[in-house]
Amino acid sequence: MPPPPHAAFLLRSRGLLPPLLRRSPSSGPPPPLLRPTRQRRGLSVRASAAELAAGVAGVEDAVVGFVTGKRKATELAHAVWRSIVRKGDTVVDATCGNGNDTFAMLKMVADERVQGRVYGLDIQESAIASTSSFLKMAVNSHELELVKLFTICHSRMEEVVPKDFPVRLVAFNLGYLPGGDKTIITVPKTTELALQAASSIVSSGGLISVLVYIGHPGGRDELDVVESFASSLPIDTWMSCKFEMLNRPAAPVLILLYKK
């Protein structure tokens, strides 16, 4: 069931939706990010009006679902990604984990007509192995060729992502590997470096998505670093949004950084 119109209006008016989404499909031409353009190497933003409208509606539904406790932060993040990422885009999963986000990204960019790219990074070999195994079972051979996996720290993403491929999305899941060693976690120092790298490679009209898990020792310290970085971005070129459950102190926090 779609959210009631008054709920969507309330969310927009209070800044709960990123600026690019504060427009109904019937309110005229889409903003620059959503307007169909000619394809560039590594970036393809052509989409039908129906796809654009569906993307916006999907995000609004996900936001209302998150606010009412019916959707997880990961679902909200994926809904926002789908409204921004287009077939043929280049995207980066900076923390592969078990491959769920890598898989979601691949489905967003894969197209037989254009060559999308997914760069997956994780410092743990077990995470890369898990992601690789999952993808081999879940996608076809053509889609699998679009994924490049690297056992490397997320702070070194610029070493593996080609400079001539504009990046539409860089996504982080910060914390520990689900089902893995909980003592091996992302840490504030390298995460800050990774955010700096992501802000350099992401293209105009692109997004940095950061889901911070804070229920483990060190989680809140890392959240502080992410929030400090997001708050320091220049307002003329960046929009920073935060989604947080205030009465659930251990719930993950989603931070979205949109580059104008």
UniProtKB/Swiss-Prot annotation:
One of its GO terms (biological process) is methylation. One of its GO terms (cellular component) is chloroplast. It is found in: Plastid, Chloroplast. Pathway: tRNA modification. S-adenosyl-L-methionine binds at residues 98, 100, 122, 124, 154. Its EC number is 2.1.1.61. Disulfide bonds: none annotated. Gene3D superfamilies: Vaccinia Virus protein VP39. InterPro entries: MnmM_MeTrfase (IPR010719), SAM-dependent_MTases_sf (IPR029063). One of its GO terms (molecular function) is methyltransferase activity. Residues 1-46 form a transit peptide. It catalyses: 5-aminomethyl-2-thiouridine(34) in tRNA + S-adenosyl-L-methionine = 5-methylaminomethyl-2-thiouridine(34) in tRNA + S-adenosyl-L-homocysteine + H(+). Residues 20-41 are annotated as: Disordered. Keywords: Chloroplast, Methyltransferase, Plastid, S-adenosyl-L-methionine, Transferase, Transit peptide, tRNA processing. It comes from the Eukaryota. Pfam families: rRNA_methylase (PF06962). Belongs to the methyltransferase superfamily. MnmM family. Involved in the biosynthesis of 5-methylaminomethyl-2-thiouridine (mnm(5)s(2)U) at the wobble position (U34) in tRNA. Catalyzes the transfer of a methyl group from S-adenosyl-L-methionine to nm(5)s(2)U34 to form mnm(5)s(2)U34. This is tRNA (mnm(5)s(2)U34)-methyltransferase, chloroplastic. It comes from Oryza sativa subsp. japonica. The lineage of its organism: Eukaryota, Viridiplantae, Streptophyta, Embryophyta, Tracheophyta.
